[in-house]
């Protein structure tokens, strides 16, 4: 079960491919995958929203640092279903994160925090709400 907060604390290096698998609950409103050093320092926040924060079936990507969210990036398409398995792949370099969604579509998001990783990113938490 992936209800609540799952703190994976896994690290991965530039060029490595990280695969995240999960199942949103049947009544899930949204879930998030956070890559960063802590809850206050997230280089990558992937937030698929079934029905949350005024969005329906939207994938929102952002970063969070110094108590502030960055600029939200929204992507078309929503290849997630409540109660169904998903797989997301994440890889990064000094320039950007590349996120491959379950349907094979890609999101590119700038890696603004590369120096703080010293070449290594960390899955801070996976939350399903």
Curated annotation (Swiss-Prot):
Pfam families the record matches: Gal-bind_lectin
Residues with N-acetylserine modification: 1
An annotated GO cellular component: extracellular space
GO MF annotations in UniProt: carbohydrate binding; galactoside binding; laminin binding
Binding site for a beta-D-galactoside: 69-75
Known function: This protein binds beta-galactoside. Its physiological function is not yet known.
Name of this protein: Beta-galactoside-binding lectin
């Amino acid at each position: 079960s992936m209800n609540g907060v799952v703190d994976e604390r896994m690290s991965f290096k530039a060029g490595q491919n990280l695969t995240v698998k999960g199942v949103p609950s049947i009544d899930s409103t949204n879930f998030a995958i956070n890559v960063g050093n802590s809850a206050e320092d997230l280089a990558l926040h992937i937030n698929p929203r079934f029905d949350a924060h005024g969005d329906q079936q939207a994938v929102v990507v952002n970063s969070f640092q110094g108590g502030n969210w960055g600029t939200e990036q929204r992507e078309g398409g929503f290849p997630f279903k409540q109660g169904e398995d998903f797989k997301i792949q994440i890889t990064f370099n000094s320039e950007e994160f590349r996120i491959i969604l379950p349907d094979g579509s890609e999101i590119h998001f700038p890696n603004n925090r590369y120096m703080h990783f010293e070449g290594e990113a960390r899955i801070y938490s996976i939350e399903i709400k």
